[in-house]
């Protein structure tokens, strides 16, 4: 009995690790697609694609997964994908934006609407919550193995055209005008920095704490959205209560 229980626990951990790895590969695939779609499928002439391919290799993403994402961006196979943003409210009225990459708008809209409804939220019309967010360029440089202090990093970021920088134990987070993120990225790479992230994304102007009684329901909504293969990003104007994950 104990042997079965041990196997069950090991299998459970493996399944959880596989699911986490699958989500990472899913996110990288979308980033590869978007980079290739915007700047072409040749990494030699597309710095953003080179960055995403480096991340894919660092995550040990299979070569066939990388090729599939690039083929999709090049139109191989005939399917046409488009980017769509959905806006809605989670439990307790928390604002959420969902970015999707889909070849079937009806399928994606139905799945996202169902997720909101199932977890006590509601899908809104275009513009219903986007005014609560600001679009910014976002660059992340990991501090591990980086021999640069905060002051030097800030000066280099500002010289490259950044607007602001936040320092955490693990990373320097650099913010730019969304139209400048590519130029700032290139300038920092020319200075020798290795970037973990360089993209334009949405940031909430303010955040609301989810009531503890709604936290499980809220997390269920986010989990279901993250599990949707069409969803590329989720932007939240909410934080969970301390101690709740």
Swiss-Prot record:
SUPFAM superfamilies found in the cross-reference section: YebC-like
Key words, A-Z: Cytoplasm, DNA-binding, Transcription, Transcription regulation
Cell location: Cytoplasm
Entry-linked InterPro entries: Integrase-like_N, TACO1_YebC-like_2nd/3rd_dom, TACO1_YebC_N, Transcrip_reg_TACO1-like, Transcrip_reg_TACO1-like_dom3, YebC-like
Region (Disordered): 1-23
Keyword Metal-binding attached: no
Keyword Transferase included in the entry's annotation: no
UniProt GO cellular component terms: cytosol
GO BP terms: regulation of DNA-templated transcription
Family stated for the protein in its record: Belongs to the TACO1 family.
Alphabetical list of HAMAP family matching this protein: Transcrip_reg_TACO1 (MF_00693)
Name of the protein in question: Probable transcriptional regulatory protein LVIS_1199
Organism whose genome encodes this protein: Levilactobacillus brevis (strain ATCC 367 / BCRC 12310 / CIP 105137 / JCM 1170 / LMG 11437 / NCIMB 947 / NCTC 947) (Lactobacillus brevis)
């Amino acid at each position: 009995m104990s042997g079965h229980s041990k196997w069950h626990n090991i299998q459970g951990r493996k399944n959880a690790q596989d699911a986490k790895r699958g989500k990472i590969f899913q996110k990288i695939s979308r980033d590869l697609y978007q980079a290739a779609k915007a700047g072409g499928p040749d990494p030699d002439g597309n710095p953003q694609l080179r960055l995403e391919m480096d991340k894919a290799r660092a995550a040990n993403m299979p070569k066939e997964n990388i090729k599939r994402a690039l083929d999709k961006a090049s139109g191989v196979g005939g399917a046409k994908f488009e980017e769509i943003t959905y806006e809605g409210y989670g439990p307790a009225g928390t604002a959420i934006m969902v970015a999707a990459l889909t070849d079937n708008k009806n399928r994606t809209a139905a799945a996202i609407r169902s997720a909101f409804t199932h977890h006590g939220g509601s899908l809104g019309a275009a513009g219903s919550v986007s005014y609560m967010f600001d679009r910014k360029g976002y660059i992340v440089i990991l501090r591990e193995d980086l021999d640069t202090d905060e002051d030097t990093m800030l000066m280099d970021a500002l010289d490259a055209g950044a607007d602001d920088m936040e320092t955490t134990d693990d990373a320097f987070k650099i913010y730019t005008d969304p139209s400048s993120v590519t130029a700032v990225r290139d300038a920092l790479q020319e200075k020798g920095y290795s970037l973990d992230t360089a993209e334009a994304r949405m940031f909430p102007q303010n955040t609301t704490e989810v009531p503890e009684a709604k936290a499980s329901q809220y997390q269920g909504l986010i989990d279901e959205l993250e599990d949707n293969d069409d969803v590329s990003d989720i932007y939240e104007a909410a934080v969970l209560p301390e101690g709740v994950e």
